[in-house]
A protein has these predicted regions:
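Glycine-rich, proline-tolerant flexible connector loops at the mouths of alpha/beta enzymes
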Residues: 38-64, 76, 100-113
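Non-cysteine beta-strand/loop elements that form the S-adenosyl-L-methionine
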Residues: 6-8, 93-104
Length: 120
């Protein structure tokens, strides 16, 4: 049996109440996960969250590219007319995890859009 590990500490872990990593901490965690533990996939952030998130993702992507790990670094993007994809590309990311609303109810009630508007 094959099991592939995806670590989400730098993205999902930071959503925990009271948890916030400084840029150097994020870079250190990425280094530890990819080089020390050999984790094959690391989700490092969410597109369009903040300028600080952009700088952290950019710095991690630069380091990962230098070390040959860029294909293992993933960034969460959204269905938003390509804005997330541009953000991730500008930060140096190469692997996008795309998040879309999973039901018509979420689209119409939370986003206040039609399904056609959501996927456009």
């Amino acid at each position: 049996m094959y099991v592939e590990i995806l670590d989400t500490t730098l993205r999902d872990g930071e959503q925990t109440s009271g948890v916030s990593f400084a840029m150097q901490e994020k870079l250190g965690i990425a280094h530890f996960l990819l080089e020390e533990l050999g984790i094959p996939r690391v989700e490092v952030g969410s597109a369009r969250v903040s300028d600080g998130e952009f700088e952290a993702v950019k710095r991690i992507c630069q380091w990962a590219d230098e070390k040959g790990h860029l294909g293992k670094v993933e960034v969460l993007g959204f269905i938003d007319g390509g804005e997330s994809l541009r953000w991730i590309k500008d930060a140096g990311g190469k692997v996008v995890k795309l998040l879309a609303k999973g039901s018509v109810r979420h689209v119409t009630e939370q986003l206040k859009k039609t399904p056609e508007q959501h996927i456009a």
